[in-house]
């Protein structure tokens, strides 16, 4: 007959075994913990090209010849390459639809978002019966099976198409025209508000993005040009995401060298305030690495 101590021990061991088995089948996000321990090995991918099927190797995707641009599904086989290199996190460039009006090039910039809560049809394979969202979920699940966490890029601005649909979301200049940030002519500056008055319409736009990426199983977000939103805006959004997933990682594109807004009409939030708002880290200005031999700081 088992003593009560042995019985408790047996039940405890069974409980631990069951918990381990469940963890083996259900992905548990641990990205913030990994990142803060400096254990994340992050690799950036552009899904639109990552798995592209250029059969004749001419550098051009000929759809008429059965070739296919990069999609969620044809990217999956290449995840094995990343796992073999011990990559444990991928930063996926934006998966939102690309604006067509005033687009740059034939495909348009991935950062010219025409919607923040739907998936870019360019990344969806028409060779599968799965829906766009189901294909995205499958990609994330396959990454997780290989021990790879997934960060999704959050565009900073809206496309001209989105401005035409919802002009109230955008900053306007003195003449009432939407503001072009920096020299990014295919996008317009979103009006996220100020530290004392967050624009709830833009907040809800971004909240919809958070809901979408969490619903496909992603583990974090990289915020493009995070400096042009108020810290209060980010804090509310980050806090919201962590009510759904406490381990949800937030990375800001920012830098100690960034000291000016992208437009006279834009907000500027320095990197230290972004960290106070809840970002786990920041990075930017990698183009300055080439100056390391001559730099003094």
Regions found by a protein language model. Name each.
Residues 98-115, 156-183, 264-274:
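Aromatic- and acidic-residue-enriched segments that line the glycan-binding/catalytic groove
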Residues 26-28, 140, 148, 208-211, ...:
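Active-site-proximal helices and loops of the catalytic beta/alpha 8
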Residues 24-149, 157:
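N-terminal structural segment of carbohydrate-active enzymes
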Residues 8-16:
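Bacterial N-terminal signal peptides
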Residues 1-8:
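Bacterial N-terminal signal peptides that target proteins for export
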Residues 91-104, 153-163, 224-230, 254-257:
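Short, solvent-exposed turn/loop segments enriched in Gly/Ser/Thr/Pro and often Arg
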Residues 162-218, 226-227:
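Active-site-adjacent "subsite" loops/lids of carbohydrate-active enzymes
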Residues 19-23:
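Sec/Tat signal peptide C-region and signal peptidase I cleavage site
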